[in-house]
Amino acid sequence: MAEINSLTELSVVTNTAETHENIAPVHVQKLDSQGRAYATGKRKDAVARVWIKPGSGKITINNKEFDKYFARPVLRMILRQPIVATNRDTQFDIIATVAGGGLSGQAGAVRHGISKALTYYEPELRTILKKGGFLTRDSRVVERKKYGKAKARRSFQFSKR
């Protein structure tokens, strides 16, 4: 870095620094060679790898239809939230592989992955998804068990006599 010798040189440097701060980050479309957007989603111990591509609205999870993989309607609703919020129900085919955790964590991980992949495919959807809270990683995990306790917080039964 060059040394600054006068106030005019200092003002030039500070003015350029201020303009860089005011510029909003430009989000560009991120696609692979096959025209798909890829993202990973996480929730609890589950990790989902999600690809989206233009299609008819078919959702495949671990090579199964999503309503076969997630039998409970609540889990299917969780998974479809970002697609419904952006009105892209029938525009994209979604392929996901998910591992780890239970079904609830896996549904949350796929939802997170779908949201991120949608922003990579259509960056203008970012504001809708951000407002809905779909792009935020849910960091809540199981609290660890402590020694001297029955569970994380539950104490052993206390007997006075």
UniProtKB/Swiss-Prot annotation:
Gene field: rpsI
Protein name per the record: Small ribosomal subunit protein uS9
Superkingdom of origin organism: Bacteria
Family matches, as InterPro entries: Ribosomal_Su5_D2-typ_SF (IPR020568), Ribosomal_uS9 (IPR000754), Ribosomal_uS9_bac/plastid (IPR023035), Ribosomal_uS9_CS (IPR020574), Ribsml_uS5_D2-typ_fold_subgr (IPR014721)
Gene Ontology CC terms, in alphabetical order: cytosolic small ribosomal subunit
GO annotation terms (biological process): translation
Keyword Nucleus found: no
Molecular function terms from GO: RNA binding; structural constituent of ribosome
Keywords: Ribonucleoprotein, Ribosomal protein
Source organism per UniProt: Bartonella henselae (strain ATCC 49882 / DSM 28221 / CCUG 30454 / Houston 1)
Family the UniProt entry places it in: Belongs to the universal ribosomal protein uS9 family.
